[in-house]
Amino acid sequence: MRDDKTKKSKLSWSKKMVRKWFNIKSKTEKFQADVSLPQGVEVEHRNSFSEREPCTIKKSKTEKLNKNWEQQARQRKMNYENPRIIDVQNHSIFVATWNVAGRSPPEDLNLDEWLHSSAPADIYVLGFQEIVPLNAGNVLGAEDNGPAKKWHSLIRKTLNNLPGASSACHTPSPIPVPIAEIDADFSGSSRQKNETFFNRRSFQTPSVWSMEENDPSISQPRLDRRFSVCDRVFFSHRPSDFDPSFRCGHRPSDYSRRPSDYSRPSDYYSRPSNYSRPSDVSRWGSSDDDNGPGDSPSTFLNSPGSFLGSAANENGYRTPWNSSQYCLVASKQMVGIFLTIWVKSELREHVKNMKVSCVGRGLMGYLGNKGSISISMLLHQTSFCFVCTHLTSGQKEGDELRRNSDVMEILKKTRFPRVQSSADEKSPENILQHDRVIWLGDLNYRIALSYRSAKALVEMQNWRALLENDQLRIEQKRGHVFKGWNEGKIYFPPTYKYSNNSDRYAGGDLHPKEKRRTPAWCDRILWHGEGLHQLSYVRGESRFSDHRPVYGIFSAEVESNHKRSKRTNSHSTARVEAEELLPYARGYTELTFF
């Protein structure tokens, strides 16, 4: 009996290793999520396959056809009796990527400056690379999920720790105003105005509540975060086109109107003229009409009373942090790649059809030290796909082609099982079938310059010259990769490679023992699909890793259906009765009136 158990366990272990080595997928990918109990208590980390398990019972084609026909007929009848209204809402999404260089987080690691860097979002999508060292034991052996649990604990604690609970003021980072055009002369206008990009294109943590940019007598505060803005900068697609009544203290999800009610996409974020908001809340940003095409986004500072943690104002509006508890809807690890998604608790019931797909692109082209984790979900009636990747490394000429190949293989091999659900729910089976797609991660694209040349341009803060030699931009313009995808404008220094616990790039002349790597924007966020508007593109300044975290804030249009209730008031009844009395022959076109 004992021999049978030992033999069975050995077979089970060997089966797992073979599956891992050759990237053999199970019928459904497991992931972890919170379980909501009736009393409201959440239990972390349940293993799940999908929100609704794909049907595994084999049925005859006749049975399936009959069932589909019955469902369609029932759905048509329901739609006829209870017509639906499509309501478009805007939800904010915080997306971040961070290569943590194989370091496990300490318990006291402070994530506040990262996750609380802006007004609270409705959805947090956090992607990590190298949460474990990429050694042979972790790549070929059993998966080490210890660091993932630590990250879960830190993220949960940070998201659910409401700033301002101790009567302290929380000042959110504003959304910058995108005013630079794609072909703007980044360096020229700055020299004309005698300003540096580091000061102009950065959000500065305020030590005073207002300052004049050109006043040398006022000391400049320490730079904590550096912002960039959307690359799709053209009329009516900029946050600067927002209505002036748009306020910082209110999330994009507070606005809900139909597309037909607006003349341009940017008007989704504005309210009617007769709508009033609390007057004591600071704005997200200001208009860019006073700036030229080569100017950098202006720095906007909020007053200390503009954002109180959990207080309500006289009009009864509570700040966004009020009751903002977040729950984990999906979490997946593949060796060092780790993707976790958190949503506000009130949105949890509207998140459906959770599915996961992993593609290994590491050793032998199959193992998971490189590759992707993709999570598919349905929010109301809009499908989302979040892809977290760690692509092939290397700064030799031609390595970018291997990264291009990784992207194409991920798009080709990522497959989601079809969910057996109601006829009106979407169930995309690949990445590009989704309505909204966000791709994040350590893409490892380098700058095609020598170390000394790139370092000199970084010190000059000449981002344009650096971006002209950025491999991702070059390959994208040539149509070799990410064709039709978008990325925000970059106004921050390269995020890789830094010396340990330092703001200095590795490999300088004074440190010959360090590995010399040309500074590069390895960590990127791209998106695909209509209805996604990037509001900011940000670099963090944590020294925890040799990479700097990168994160962006998106406003996503989400469609939801509402059944139209039948009204039987006197006016509608009278109108129907009058129409029924009218004589008619074959159709409405042949009506004869008295």
Swiss-Prot record:
It is found in: Nucleus; Cell membrane. This is Type IV inositol polyphosphate 5-phosphatase 7. The keyword Hydrolase applies. GO terms for molecular function: inositol-polyphosphate 5-phosphatase activity; phosphatidylinositol-3,4,5-trisphosphate 5-phosphatase activity; phosphatidylinositol-4,5-bisphosphate 5-phosphatase activity. Broadly expressed in emerging organs. Mostly localized in procambium of growing organs. Restricted to vascular differentiating cells of young organs. It comes from Arabidopsis thaliana. Residues 246-300 are annotated as: Disordered. Its main location: nucleus. Cvp1 and cvp2 double mutant displays high PtdIns(4,5)P2 levels. Residues 435-450 are annotated as: Catalytic 1. GO terms for biological process: cellular response to salt stress; leaf vascular tissue pattern formation; phosphatidylinositol dephosphorylation; regulation of reactive oxygen species metabolic process.
